[in-house]
Amino acid sequence: ILGPNGFEWLPFSDFIVSYPGILIAFIFASLPFSSKDFVLKTGGRRAGEIGTYSSIAVLWQWGLGTLFALAVLSFIWPELHPGFGTLLAAGFVGGHGTAAAIGSTFMDRGWDEAQSLAMISATVGILCSIVGGMLWIRWGSQKGVTNFITPFKDLPDELRTGLIPENKRESVGSETVSPLAIDPIIFHFAIIASAAVIGYYIGIWSSDLMSDYRIPTFSLAFLVAILLKWGLKTFRGYQYIDQKISLRLCGSFTDLLVVFGITSIQIPLLIKYAFPLFGLFIVGILICWALFFYLGPIVFRENWFEKSLYTWGWVTGIMAIAIALLRIVDAKNKANILSDFAVAYFAIGPLEVLLVTLAPVLIMNGYQWGFSIVTLGAGILLLLIILFLKMRMAAECNPQDPGKPHQITDIRSE
């Protein structure tokens, strides 16, 4: 509110919008040093679950958003551009970066309002992410479906106030190197920063090889950190890495990311347009609600609420909000969701890039109906495959009663 996009009392840098992207790389680079080792058998399955769930969310936003705009909104507002429905996915699941990419592409092809509309979509998406996420947390804590928090009234004072009594305080870490040589916190920061910087330059190199695609920096930073951790273990240097210090650095990066992510919101864009964006946003919220409430408990074998909440955060807003919501329900990263998502994003990322690249080209060439139907159809097909595999797995695990309903049915009926 007090920043450059509000009352302009706090003179932040003009580059503040780029800070969240930088901090995300540091967060993911710190994960291998602050969490348990990724086990391929169980970790691969978890990454596959969250990757499939996220892919369905991406495909449904692109497909249903475009189809709704073509089939419904265009009858009410005939002057709407055929690509209007893509603004939902561009802003919600894409964020401001994708919104800028989609908007500029459409502008180059004659749709002058695309850039402003896409940025509004991204801004509204962030608000939906925050408000909706907090409502989900309240609902989850009341229903008892959260695994790492309890109803607010039953929480201890330190969790309700944020202030820890002296008799409950824990050490934030141990000195693994002498402060006379280098401060332990700076030492750990340097290790994490090295992985993030190397990942950044690998991303630049990948964009030179593939001119239309750049591997996300945060995924590369995570991969480099895993390799760095393996190297340190191989040469017996990992004994000087303290997991608690790494975790605290990860938490610090997350707090900064949330601050700069919210500060970079451009408030004037929220009041510039109203209709027919309102109808498009309602459809987007309903899509994400259905995915959270119905599909999440089916797809995820464990920690379904935390994983669905994290996905809600980034498919409606930005990664910063997703991490902030996850920090509320899983402050100590016990579910290892960020690690799983970093692996899964190697499949989600190319899908997003493919859609962002093809959507404007196909729509501007008159294939808007075909694009929406094929995209939505792919999402439905992926859903049917998941449902089939889950039903088959349930039948194998419970042959006496293969049709037993999922346990979440009782929660929804309360």
Please provide the spans of the model-predicted regions.
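Intrinsically disordered, low-complexity non-transmembrane regions of multi-pass membrane transporters
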Residues: 139-186, 233-239, 391-414
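C-terminal transmembrane helix pair
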Residues: 260, 267, 281-392
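Juxtamembrane helix-boundary/capping and inter-helix hinge elements in multi-pass membrane proteins
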Residues: 34-48, 73-82, 104-116, 141-150, ...
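Structural signature of hydrophobic alpha-helical transmembrane segments
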Residues: 13-28, 82-89, 212-224, 249, ...
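Flexible hinge motifs at transmembrane-helix junctions and intramembrane kinks/re-entrant loops
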Residues: 6, 18, 71, 200-244
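Hydrophobic transmembrane alpha-helices of secondary-active transporters
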Residues: 1-5, 13-45, 223-232, 248-271, ...
